Amino acid sequence: MRLIKAARVILFGAPGVGKGTQSERLLSRFPQLNTISTGDLLRHNVKNRTPLGIKVESTMKSGGLVADDLMLRLISNELFTRGWLKGQGPPSVMMLASEAITSEHSAYRQPPIDSFVASPFHHDEGMPPRVSDDPAASFILDGFPRTAPQAGNLDKIVPINLVVSIKTPLSVIIKRIAGRWVHEPSGRVYNTSFNAPRVPGRDDITGEPLIQRADDAEDVYRTRFRKFQETSEPVLEHYAKKGVLVEVEGMSSDEISPKLYAEFEKRFVQ
């Protein structure tokens, strides 16, 4: 199905609610839609030992959060690199993008990492970047924002025009995560109840072993769920005030997907 204008989307939901499954289905149904994963951008830099990757590696390994300024610059530079933002770009560009984009720009000289991180993110308020409304500039942003201040700063870079809060009962999610297996290097997620790997315990793409995450244990998950509720509420309120928040409820991914499709078609197809 073809989009007629750019969709700039964030999916919100508790861990295990099925955001990854819904993203994959949306990408399949709407070919112009792309995904921008801040986690993938960071992992790519760490894997390739870029100056940026070296800087954030210890923070990521310890489970800490990368500084907001750096995350905002990652997103901004990715959008400028893809051509989805026009105008005065960020003051410096590190290794930020997917392998294809990185390869294309591999001759670029990287600025010192300290100056990249130390200078706060900003853009010229008098000359805000122009956001492409080309349907090919459609994306789902994954992993950011996590707080209301982050959402406010993201607004200054690119206006998100749809935020979907996906809701499934806690008891259903707990049962679901009991069957969840993960390919840790790529982040691919499987479930023995649905979307099972072709070979039990092995990743479909690489054949490497799958693991069950320690934080999927029920007691740990309940703590994560409460924390998600506390932190997500102000973010959702922010987007509700912007008039772009939609809630979608369902007991399963198959129940949720048609509702998501309908929302996309109403906003970006018709």
Task: Identify the function of each model-found stretch.
Residues M1-Q270:
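Glycine-rich phosphate-binding loop of ATP-dependent small-molecule kinases
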